[in-house]
Amino acid sequence: MGAIGGDELVQWDKMGAAEAVNGGCGGAGKMDRIQVLVRLRPLSEKEVARREPAEWECINDSTVMFRSTFPDRPTAPTAYTFDRVFHSDCSTKEVYEEGVKEVALSVVSGINSSIFAYGQTSSGKTYTMTGVTEYTVADIYDYINKHEERAFVLKFSAIEIYNEVIRDLLSAENTPLRLWDDAEKGTYVENLTEVVLRDWNHLKGLISVCEAQRRTGETFLNEKSSRSHQILRLTVESSAREFLGKDKSTTLVASANFVDLAGSERASQALSAGTRLKEGCHINRSLLALGTVIRKLSMGSNAHIPYRDSKLTRILQPSLGGNARTAIICTLSPATSHIEQSRNTLLFGSCAKEVVTNAQVNVVMSDKALVKHLQKELARLESELRHPVQSSSLETLLKEKDNQIRKMEKEIKELKSQRDLAQSRLQDLLQSVGDHDLNRQVQGKHSVRSPPSVGMPPSVSRDDSSQVSHDDSDLYKEVRCIESNRTGGNDQLDLSAGESSSPQDSNMNSGLHGNDSNASVNSRHSRPSGEAPITLEEHLENIRRPFVSLAKDLGSSTRNSSNLRVIGRSRSCRSLTGSTMFDDMEMDDCTPLNRSLVEFPGRPVESHRRGSALHYDAETDTLSRAGSMSSEISTFKDAKTNGSVACDTEFTGIGEFVAELKEMAQVHYQKQLGDQNANGKSIGLDPIEGVSQSPSRWPLEFEKKQQEIIELWQACSISLVHRTYFFLLFKGEAADSIYMEVELRRLSFLRDTYSRGSTPSNAIVGSLSTSPVASAKKLQREREMLARQMQKRLSTEEREHTYTKWGVSLDSKRRKLQVARRLWTETKDLEHVRESASLVAKLIGLQEPGQVLKEMFGLSFAPQQQPTRRRSSNGWRYGIPSFA
């Protein structure tokens, strides 16, 4: 059986009627109120002959007003508002199209519907209901003809309630029928005739039979007055046809009730007696019971509803606040003689519009589906009999135990990770404490004492000393450059060496390299065998001490020298340090940037061709650059002659710069170990054992730094796009250590600055001034941008899957913004961080992060050139841009 067709049935799908209930209702009920309409009839011929004025007037489409000034009941309201009001010139077609059509046609979608006509006698109830019934049936057949994919079966039945006796209008026998209550069917009429309709003409003939069978009589107010309540019921069953598929096996069943109530009347006005008086009494009694039920339902209380006070209310119980959509047409006479009856009708309608109904789609299983369902149920029961131990409670207990086991396994994994991290920290702490004492002991035994002239030690050749000094000096400069990111470069030690005409200056310069070499050798080989090597910062701290002791004497002598030559700084150092570290140098020239990390231990061999090392020439007492062009050599004396100094900067591309940093970090350990072993043998020391343990700690160190960076991102309100790029690019390789260290120190500086309530300097954040409030606002705007990108980047299915995955209700409002606000919020949950990065990458169009993106990320470490006038020089100020 196939799918349901039609726009009306699509609405049924939205109401949640996919789940079938055997013999009952399926889907979620739709809360609705009874729709109340008012139709004002024109004055009759008798009323016109008596010259009775029209006391009621429709002032708009929803309000009827009492316009007479006759002081009948001054406390009564003069205006009543309903869902729709039709004046006397409106036709029955308009009443149907604009009032009850939507309710009546709910029957083809599996929803029960009921249409009442309520009012005083001679107000036009039967006239209105006859036209509404014909228009409804015509539209139902028109709907059936347009939806041939479903098979429809229509059944018709008709009853009247005359003097509280139920009679079948389709039967020639005048036998009273009885009401029965059933748990599944509800209240039904026993032995009621139900005819299966062939076509529209067949139904017309049956309606004519009902009109002929109904009890009518003449009264003073009406020549042909209905003396009974008439209920016409049209049952519609629909199911998909077999040739459209076999997966659909449910049937929609609904009924439409057309209720023409007898009119209320006063005996004094109708001048009724005998039989007419008895009929009027039963009519008024049943209408009174109906009014009581409506009034109690409108109050919304849980009190008893007296449905059983009348057979009319018992039959219509599902339509009154039950499983049906209901519309009541209140017919009104505008004549002065019917003012009190008209007001009672309007009061009834005012109460009825407050009654709430719960209409549901009625889905019934077919025989085939029911048999299949019963077979499955039988198999399940037989299985339980064969295995009585496997009960539902036992299955629930097993599921709970499995959940506890998974939870404990997760906790054990986290505890193991914390244990490994604690052991690593303890090992580093013990190692650093032992190194302090061992360095002092080994320094007294193996250090080379320099003479008062600070000359070169005799046991070490000049070439080896120069090589070691350059190696350690460049290493020292690189780490100090990274530290300048935090301190702003105010406490940097600026050293300059120049050509001196006196031997004392030359010896002092040589002594500087000698002390550097000795300090590096002592720090490298002062460890017992079997321990892990000291960290890079501890090693360079030992190198820094002799520099500090010689800085004062060397600085005073070099400033007064007439042949001062500035040692070129590495390009990476100038890129990473701020401009403040050059502010203390009282000179008017610009330092040439022509060394590109030449002697860094992790420098690849092929990168040495970009710049050659500085060598000390003992014969000429000058510093020269081997293999370089003559245009790259300039002295302070030449600068005074020419009046300006040319800043010869050799900027490499961003891609080359990032590649160099990655390659240097990757081979840093192997290169350093080789240099340490060679230098150790040259002075008679044993090589360090256990050096290979150092790289093994990097995965744990990476996880630790990554977690700290993620928490600092959240604390400093860093851009989500920056977080995503950084998290996806650097995944724990040895070459990522430089990026991790720089990012961690930058974020720590921002956090400390925010905590003090100050604003980071331009040397750190570049050209952008930031604050916690500004960063939070930028982050909020970025989340709103990502929410807008979800509409563009994701399809409807992907968005719904994303809402479910991120715990956002599909019925809530601003779902995309809710998802965006949950990104990157759980800093302790690495899986949450990974999912956040994946979603942000998808929204910004990042499909597959590769080397190209790493080169783009290298821009973060490139210098920002801001022209700044410094005295008489045309220098450049460099700073690290901000990611905040």
Swiss-Prot record:
One of its GO terms (cellular component) is microtubule. Pfam families: DUF3490 (PF11995), Kinesin (PF00225). Residues 449-460 have a biased composition (Low complexity). Keywords: ATP-binding, Coiled coil, Microtubule, Motor protein, Nucleotide-binding. Residues 461-483 have a biased composition (Basic and acidic residues). ATP binds at G119, Q120, T121, S122, S123, G124, K125, T126. Residues 364-435 form a coiled coil. One of its GO terms (biological process) is microtubule-based movement. Signal peptide: none annotated. GO terms for molecular function: ATP binding; microtubule binding; microtubule motor activity. The keyword ATP-binding applies. Residues 498-523 have a biased composition (Polar residues). PANTHER family: CENTROMERE PROTEIN E, KINESIN-LIKE PROTEIN KIN-7C. Belongs to the TRAFAC class myosin-kinesin ATPase superfamily. Kinesin family. KIN-7 subfamily. This is Kinesin-like protein KIN-7C. The lineage of its organism: Eukaryota, Viridiplantae, Streptophyta, Embryophyta, Tracheophyta.
